[in-house]
UniProtKB/Swiss-Prot annotation:
Disulfide pairings: none
Region spans: Disordered: 27-52
GO biological process: iron coordination entity transport
Organism: Bacillus subtilis (strain 168)
Protein topology in the membrane: Lipid-anchor
Transmembrane domains' residue ranges: none
Bias-annotated ranges (Basic and acidic residues): 37-51
Subunit comment: The complex is composed of one ATP-binding protein (YfmF), two transmembrane proteins (YfmD and YfmE) and a solute-binding protein (YfmC).
Domain Fe/B12 periplasmic-binding, residue spans: 60-315
Induction (free text): Transcriptionally regulated by fur.
Localization terms from the record: Cell membrane
Pfam families: Peripla_BP_2 (PF01497)
Designated name of the protein: Fe(3+)-citrate-binding protein YfmC
Phylogenetic lineage: Bacteria, Bacillati, Bacillota, Bacilli, Bacillales
Length: 315
């Protein structure tokens, strides 16, 4: 009888242990499933500072550069805060209509107190301008730091892709880039097959003239369209005198000028200017300062490309 009881106790112990093991496995699976769900809702975003984790779909976004506004707007989001240099008309010009947002100051010195008051769930900052305030921004909200001000065209595309991922809109981002590529390719097809002239854009300020070389943002747009660039260089920008410009002697010259009088106004009476091929052949064109050199987004690059064809070929 005692032997029977011992056997029964042993059997019951085994069954109890089995139940505990099964229960533990079930609990572990449930926990793992929950973990996977949370992981799926969070994304690790790699940026110029390393990596940042962004959760869910950000709704309250603050952008500190104009190309980032171009990106988020094209992805269907209106930022709650924009570093607009206190120029609401410039923002309207970029997005094509008036939008409701709060100015967070200038791109060079955004107001951290105002940014914090907006309670953002994502801040998009420039790798060059905002490097020194990155840690402060990070304390306010998840912050990604990307290239804009010093970005090439390809780096602008990379930044757009990263922003789409951060906003949980990767598929939409891919669609937008495919549409953008088609626009550029269609414009490229309009360039005459026998076009062999070279081209360059210069930024005219009160006391200086800076050429944007083949490795600059707009220089890459010229190349994408099929033009030969007049200044091939690994340095994106090259400040030149009138004498140096006359040696380069571009066939086509686009000039993006600051407000007010510029150094070009002085040059226009100089024989060196008058003898430039672009001047003699009527191939000097204005380039909108905002669209060509400040906005630096995918939509503004399309506008710039269309501007070239319209002005050079009347298309």
């Amino acid at each position: 009888m005692r032997t029977y009881s011992n056997k029964l106790i042993a059997i019951m112990s085994v069954l109890l242990l089995a139940c505990l093991i099964v229960s533990g496995c079930s609990s572990s699976q449930n926990n793992n499933g929950s973990g996977k769900s949370e992981s799926k809702d969070s994304r690790v975003i790699h940026d110029e500072e390393g990596k940042t984790t962004v959760s869910g779909t950000p709704k309250r976004v603050v952008v500190l550069e104009l190309s980032f506004l171009d990106a988020v707007h094209n992805l269907g989001i209106t930022p709650v805060g924009i570093a607009d240099d206190n120029k609401k008309d410039m923002i309207k010009k970029l997005v094509g209509s008036s939008i409701d947002y709060t100015s967070v100051g200038t791109r060079s010195e955004p107001n951290l107190e105002v940014i914090s008051s907006l309670k953002p769930d994502l801040i998009i900052a420039d790798a060059e301008r905002h490097k020194n305030i990155y840690k402060q921004l990070k304390k306010i909200a998840p912050t990604i730091e990307l290239k804009s001000r010093e970005a090439t065209y390809d780096e602008t595309i990379d930044s757009f892709t990263t922003i789409a991922k951060a906003l949980n809109k990767e598929d939409e981002g891919k669609e937008k880039l495919a549409e953008h590529k088609k626009v550029i390719n269609d414009l490229k097809a309009e360039l005459p097959k026998d076009e062999n002239r070279n081209i360059v854009l210069g930024v005219a300020r009160a006391d200086s003239f800076q050429l944007h070389t083949s490795s600059s943002y707009d220089g890459e747009i010229f190349k994408m369209l099929g033009f030969t660039h007049a200044v091939k260089s690994d340095n994106a920008y090259q400040e030149v005198s009138l004498e140096q410009l006359s040696k380069i002697d571009p066939d086509i010259l686009f000039i993006s000028a600051n407000e007010g009088k510029t150094i070009v106004d002085e040059w226009k009476t100089n024989p060196l200017w008058k003898n430039l091929k672009a001047v003699k052949n009527g191939q000097v064109y204005d380039a909108d300062r905002d669209t060509w050199t400040r906005f630096r987004g995918i939509k503004s690059s399309e506008t710039s490309a269309k501007d070239v064809l319209k002005k050079v070929y009347n298309k």
